[in-house]
Amino acid sequence: MIDTKQLIKAGEEKMTFAIEYLDEQLSHIRAGKANPKILDCVKVMYYGAPVPLTNVATVTVPDARTIMITPWEKKIIRDIEKGILDSELGITPENNGEVIRLGIPPLTEERRRQLVKQCKQEAENAKISVRNARRDAIEALKKSIKSDGVPEDVEKDAEAEVQKIHDKFIKKIDELYAAKEKEVMTV
């Protein structure tokens, strides 16, 4: 006898992963104000190896339009600057020899619309992942139920449970997208 709860839980875990991934991707999209997460993709050459910026410097946000980077070793300040320029963030670093300041320029209307499109694409990718997880869970349920000769009503109940979980996650994706869209479009 199969445990339908286990199969449903496995599908739910895949859906949860899709939501967490979407949340992370949306946090990397800048919304006109300083957010240190936009620097997560920056790699710095440190003793010949690329390492994340946060491994070689402290990143702080002194005000809404500035990110300040304080390297732990002063000699790598040029490497940090190069890493920021190479990451194509569209932000020019200001280096005073001690710290690097990144002035976050206000977003133009056109750039805001591009970012909203990017957010929408990320949300759509998450929805696809959730739908695939639902499909996989339902297929696993059908396969297991068919091989064990379980009554049809148990199968229908399990499918309904998977669908309910799916709908909850799709709603959550829509909420995350709407919140990010509002954040990006707010001047």
Swiss-Prot record:
One of its GO terms (cellular component) is cytoplasm. The keyword Cytoplasm applies. InterPro entries: Ribosome_recyc_fac, Ribosome_recyc_fac_dom, RRF_sf. CDD domains: RRF. One of its GO terms (biological process) is translational termination. Its main location: cytoplasm. The keyword Protein biosynthesis applies. One of its GO terms (molecular function) is ribosomal large subunit binding. It is found in: Cytoplasm. Keywords: Cytoplasm, Protein biosynthesis. Pfam families: RRF. Belongs to the RRF family. Responsible for the release of ribosomes from messenger RNA at the termination of protein biosynthesis. May increase the efficiency of translation by recycling ribosomes from one round of translation to another. This is Ribosome-recycling factor.
